Amino acid sequence: MKFIGLATLSLFALASADKFPVPDSITVAEGSSKCGDQAQLSCCNDVKYGGDTTVVQKGIAAGLLSDLLGAGSAAEGLGAFSGCSKLDISLLIGIEDILNQKCKQNIACCAKSGGSADGDLVGATLPCIALGSIL
């Protein structure tokens, strides 16, 4: 009986673990610099990643452009993040604050854009990418 409880707890821990964890030593400033000037360091409540795909390539030039276009494992880390709030460096008191202490959920780099999908027929907002996938 104890084994079943331990096995269930272990499976739950694996399922709830972050897919792209951020090391404990990364500061907010370092995380922001990894995002670059075109993205904003954000803390997101929820994320949904697309499923893994397997593509069988046939022929001489098969799959030549697939990695350039974002197919397969090249799209790793891209997800649908929701409930994101920006982590602004200028508002933080200590610039050396540890990132994992400021955000306990999903840490991501979200594109800086004024775009919004609200009230638009074909509205789209740019996605976020998990910070742990680019470290």
Swiss-Prot record:
Transmembrane segments: none
Entry keyword annotation includes Oxidoreductase: no
Top-rank taxon, per record: Eukaryota
An example Gene Ontology CC term for this record: fungal-type cell wall
Record SMART domains: HYDRO
GO molecular function, one term: structural constituent of cell wall
Intrachain S-S bonds: C35-C109, C43-C103, C44-C84, C110-C128
Keyword check for Aminoacyl-tRNA synthetase: no
Keywords: Conidiation, Disulfide bond, Secreted, Signal, Sporulation
Main location: secreted
Protein localization: Secreted; Spore wall
Coiled coil feature spans: none
Region forming the signal peptide: 1-17
Stored Pfam families: Hydrophobin (PF01185)
Record's note on what induces expression: Expressed after 12 to 24 hours post induction of asexual development, which correlates with the development of metulae and phialides. Not expressed in hyphae and strongly induced during development.
Subunit-level organization: Self-assembles to form functional amyloid fibrils called rodlets. Self-assembly into fibrillar rodlets occurs spontaneously at hydrophobic:hydrophilic interfaces and the rodlets further associate laterally to form amphipathic monolayers.
Purpose: Aerial growth, conidiation, and dispersal of filamentous fungi in the environment rely upon a capability of their secreting small amphipathic proteins called hydrophobins (HPBs) with low sequence identity. Class I can self-assemble into an outermost layer of rodlet bundles on aerial cell surfaces, conferring cellular hydrophobicity that supports fungal growth, development and dispersal; whereas Class II form highly ordered films at water-air interfaces through intermolecular interactions but contribute nothing to the rodlet structure.
Stated family: Belongs to the fungal hydrophobin family.
Protein name per the record: Class I hydrophobin dewB
Organism listed in the record: Emericella nidulans (strain FGSC A4 / ATCC 38163 / CBS 112.46 / NRRL 194 / M139)
This protein's encoding gene: dewB
